[in-house]
Amino acid sequence: ATSNSKPTQVLLATFLTFFFLLLNNVNSSDELSFTINNFVPNEADLLFQGEASVSSTGVLQLTRVENGQPQQYSVGRALYAAPVRIWDNTTGSVASFSTSFTFVVKAPNPTITSDGLAFFLAPPDSQIPSGRVSKYLGLFNNSNSDSSNQIVAVEFDTYFGHSYDPWDPNYRHIGIDVNGIESIKTVQWDWINGGVAFATITYLAPNKTLIASLVYPSNQTSFIVAASVDLKEILPEWVRVGFSAATGYPTQVETHDVLSWSFTSTLEANSDAATENNVHIARYTA
């Protein structure tokens, strides 16, 4: 569900403020924090896979663009080079994290689009799977959607209404994916062609909740989805974080441009550090 009212934005802003206060006050043993306001070609802090690159204007282009036009069957990923410790095998502690980024998806023909992009966490040595992976957003293929993947992702899926992807709902959507392309929770996404989207994804370790939210400031619409996800049961102790995107048929192409990105994670030394008030976030889901 969606909302175009200010109360939703106030709730979101209040939650995010509260989350960062939580991160700043816990006794942490490991943390990673970075902000990239403008990407540069051959960005040293990023690992590029497939056809991902940085343009001369400082935009992270996850899929191939030639002469300003998106190209068919393009797959690309960009990951932050430094691994993130998402949980501690000795103490059992699990990290909370928050990531925010702005991005644009622009299609020559907005009525038929594919395939979308995703933010994901995966093993440090994760690579683009072999085979045709466009409809799997460069994260999976038709033979590896199982627990061996060790991948958690939030997808921004632009392809819908086709039997080719029977797992998808009949609308563009934001989905939470665990080890496979079929989302465990989705919310309808009223994508704006060429609009700048502001996305925030947070994970609250004390109650194992992953929350994804997206706002289009240009028309004051927001979208929020949340699900229970146990990162310690799904991911290895160390992961890399990044983006993946893909395009499909020649008539169903789009750009996948990330304009800025920030990330903060804190591995709590005491998993009971959060109070009851810190985990009441179900009210923000639609």
UniProtKB/Swiss-Prot annotation:
Query: Secretion signal: which residues?
Result: 1-28
User: What residues does the annotated propeptide cover?
Assistant: 278-286
Record-linked CDD domains: lectin_legume_LecRK_Arcelin_ConA
Glycosylation annotated at which residues? N89, N141, N207, N219
Name the keywords, alphabetized.
Answer: Calcium, Glycoprotein, Lectin, Manganese, Metal-binding, Signal
Q: Which PANTHER family match?
A: CONCANAVALIN A-LIKE LECTIN FAMILY PROTEIN (PTHR32401), LECTIN (PTHR32401:SF45)
Record's function text: Sialic acid-binding lectin specifically recognizing the trisaccharide sequence Neu5Ac/Gc-alpha-2,3-Gal-beta-1,4-GlcNAc/Glc.
Q: Which family does it belong to?
A: Belongs to the leguminous lectin family.
- Name of the protein in its database record: Bark leucoagglutinin
Q: Which organism does this record belong to?
A: Maackia amurensis (Amur maackia)
Source organism lineage?
Eukaryota, Viridiplantae, Streptophyta, Embryophyta, Tracheophyta
